[in-house]
A protein has these predicted regions:
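Start-transfer (signal-anchor) and selected internal transmembrane alpha helices
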Residues: 1-25
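Hydrophobic alpha-helical transmembrane segments
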Residues: 12, 103, 130-134, 176-180
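Membrane-interface coil-to-helix junctions
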Residues: 18-113, 134-157
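Hydrophobic transmembrane alpha-helices
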Residues: 113, 117, 121, 159-168, ...
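Transmembrane-helix signature of polytopic, membrane-embedded enzymes
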Residues: 116-138
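Transmembrane helix irregularities
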Residues: 138, 142, 170, 184-192
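Membrane-interface transmembrane helices that cradle and orient dolichyl/undecaprenyl
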Residues: 162-177, 185
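Single conserved hydrophobic/aromatic residue that forms the stacking wall/gate
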Residues: 197-206
Length: 206
């Protein structure tokens, strides 16, 4: 879909509002995230994945010798073991993981916002798409978890693209895209996805 000048203005305004929220939260001196949880988990464990890869050269390790007394590394999959977002950091070993996680968290919300707006614009008027996107941006789960528990929201761009791809699928367009976005979404949070395949968990979800 080609964006009009008004669409671009809407996206810039929405992005600006979100960045002002980030600025108000951090005030140029605080981390965009929970210093307690992120310092001990969301920074530290992905950084351990990256360091272990560079130390061993093993892309599929099975054991984390330096966590506790050593444990199965898949116990830590909750923290993005094969998430495409975390894997990209392997290409940037010179960037501190604390900096990287904050940046990708902010970029992830902006990407989700833009994708949602474009999706809504395909169905509604410009102003309605803007209003819906504003509500989406400041929905409590999205805005809260973006700086508290990133694994609950970092799959969002892939989920939205997956929804758009499903619509394309039923219209006979680009059928393979559903598989692509679903794969990336599941790799981002496959720790939770596996629960769908257990009968007890499925009953609880229903």
């Amino acid at each position: 879909m080609k964006l009009s000048k008004k669409n671009i203005i809407h996206l810039c305004v929405l992005t600006g509002i979100y960045l002002l929220f980030v600025l108000a939260l951090t005030r140029f001196k605080y981390a965009y995230g929970s210093e307690l949880d992120w310092g001990g988990q969301h920074y530290a464990i992905p950084d351990y994945f990256r360091k272990l890869f560079y130390k061993t050269g093993d892309f599929f390790p099975s054991f984390a010798p330096n966590i506790g007394c050593g444990e199965n590394i898949y116990n830590l999959s909750y923290y993005g073991l094969y998430s495409p977002i975390i894997l990209f950091s392997y290409l940037l070993p010179f960037v501190k993981m604390s900096t990287y996680i904050q940046i990708v968290s902010i970029i992830g919300i902006i990407a989700s916002l833009w994708i949602f707006y474009i999706w809504m614009r395909q169905k509604f008027t410009d102003n309605t798409a803007f209003a819906l996107s504003f509500v989406f941006l400041f929905s409590a789960p999205l805005i809260f978890h973006s700086h508290r528990h990133i694994m609950f929201v970092n799959y969002m761009p892939f989920l939205l693209l997956g929804f758009m791809a499903i619509e394309d699928y039923f219209e006979g367009k680009r059928k393979y895209m559903v598989t692509l976005w679903a794969f990336l979404m599941l790799m981002t949070s496959y720790f939770f996805a596996c629960l769908l395949y257990t009968s007890d968990a499925a009953d609880d979800l229903i």
